[in-house]
Structures are given as structure tokens and as C-alpha cells.
Amino acid sequence: MRSSNSPATVAPEIPTADETAVPGLVMSSWHAFFVPRGTPKEIIATLNAAAVKALSDPTVRARLTDIGQKLYAPEELTPEVLGARQKADIEKWWPIIRAAGIRAE
């Protein structure tokens, strides 16, 4: 079972959770670079530009697609979009974490 809302490109025969046991369950993962608070915006912009350049390389994109990674358009690969994604994930999962009594150790 896959927890995404779309079939895996590498194994499209595997049904999604929404299609089988858990309607409405959609989970995804994402990857990001983080820097210490107070890092100058110019450094953040330089690091982001390098990451976008690497992720725009056709060979890199093909390999990531081959292993089933969802790829985003360059305009979606910004600190602002990441911040919005983090905020949405926190708003979605925090009530569940709290209700389950999950605590960091």
C-alpha cells in the first residue's frame, strides 16, 4: 500500500491507501537543506540556486524520476514554498501527534 495520493511510478500496481484500507490518508515526504538561524539571505540564495541547478539537470531528474521521486518545478524550490509546506504539515499532523501523546525523546 502506498500512502501517496497517486500510484508509484516504479510500481504502479501497488494501490494507494486511499484506494484500499484508509480512505483520505495521504502522506508524503520531502527533502530540504537547512541552515542556522541568522544565515545571511545571500548565502541562502546561493545555496538554493545551486540546489535548483542540480535538480534541473536532465540526468539528475531522470534518475530521481526512475526511483519514484516527485519532482517540483524550479519556482516551487524556494525557501518560501518550503516554509509554507512545513507550516501546512505542522497544522495537519500536530493535532494527531498531540492526541496520540507522541513526544520527542
Please state what every model-predicted region is.
Residues M1-E105:
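Conserved, function-defining micro-sites of small-solute handling proteins
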